[in-house]
């Protein structure tokens, strides 16, 4: 497919996703909104597959089939009352994907120099940081909604200072990552990843189980911004648009 066709397909998908959000906002149009979302995703996947940038089909297709089958089984088995749990665990997948895309993007494009390197590294560290919080926070939210983790808030002494310390630590190591190359840069990025995972756990553990539906909405927003960051790293316009839609709607 030519770049023009791919861009057109992505634009159509973006419009369908917007229509999907509009349809899902009301019960009487929810079914139609869901269909819009399905159609938009099918177009996006096909456009990406035939973009000429995908080569390892022998690995990709089986993984897509496995994911599709697992998703269909979960959607069929999960009761509507347990839908927040399913949404929470799906958010964790988005966060994990953003972390892996960020690390892989750095390893593939570590030879950037100058302004290009700075911009790319900022995209990477933001994607990894937001993705890490989304992943670990969503796993905890899933556990609390399911009852596997106590719904009682875990209120550690000085928890706000601890959160601030982790945030400042992430900024420091992110700065070190941007201003380093090779193994030191990778080590700093992995430290940011670890801090974000711990921060996600600590943030959600401090919230009671009764407030988890609100937390899921917040994590929905986080997953959107993580996807948008991944879109910048992959230079994928549709991923940026979709991530921004999800992030703002969350």
Predicted regions and their residues:
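Transmembrane alpha-helix boundary signature
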Residues: 48-61, 73-84, 99-115, 180-181
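Transmembrane helix-loop junctions at the membrane interface of multipass transporters and ion channels
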Residues: 104-114, 179-184, 214, 222-241
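Structural signature of hydrophobic alpha-helical transmembrane segments
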Residues: 1-14, 51-69, 120-135, 182-195
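N-terminal transmembrane signal-anchor/hairpin module of polytopic inner-membrane proteins
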Residues: 1-57
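Cytoplasmic-side transmembrane-helix entry/capping segments in multi-pass membrane proteins
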Residues: 31-40, 60-63, 82-94, 153-163, ...
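Interhelical loops and loop-helix junctions of multi-pass membrane transporters/channels
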Residues: 80-136, 140-159
């Amino acid at each position: 497919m030519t770049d023009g066709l791919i861009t057109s397909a992505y634009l159509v998908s973006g419009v369908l996703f917007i229509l999907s959000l509009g349809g899902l906002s009301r019960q009487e149009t929810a079914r139609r909104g869901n269909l819009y979302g399905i159609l938009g995703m099918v177009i996006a996947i096909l456009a990406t597959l035939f973009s000429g940038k995908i080569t390892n089909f022998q690995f990709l297709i089986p993984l897509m089939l496995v994911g599709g089958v697992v998703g269909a089984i979960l959607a069929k088995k999960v009761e509507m009352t347990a839908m927040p749990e399913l949404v929470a665990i799906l958010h964790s997948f988005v966060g994990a994907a953003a972390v892996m895309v960020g690390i892989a993007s750095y390893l593939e494009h570590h030879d950037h120099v100058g302004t290009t390197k700075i911009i790319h590294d900022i995209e990477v560290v933001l994607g990894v940081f937001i993705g890490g919080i989304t992943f670990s926070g969503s796993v905890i939210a899933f556990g609390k909604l399911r009852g596997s983790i106590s719904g009682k808030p875990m209120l550690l002494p000085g928890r706000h200072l601890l959160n601030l310390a982790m945030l400042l630590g992430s900024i420091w190591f992110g700065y070190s990552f941007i201003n380093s190359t090779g193994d030191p840069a990778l080590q700093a990025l992995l430290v940011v990843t670890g801090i974000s995972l711990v921060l996600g756990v600590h943030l959600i553990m401090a919230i009671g189980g009764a407030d988890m539906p609100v937390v899921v909405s917040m994590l929905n927003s986080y997953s959107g911004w993580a996807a948008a960051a991944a879109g910048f790293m992959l230079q994928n316009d549709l991923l940026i648009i979709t991530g921004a839609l999800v992030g703002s709607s969350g």
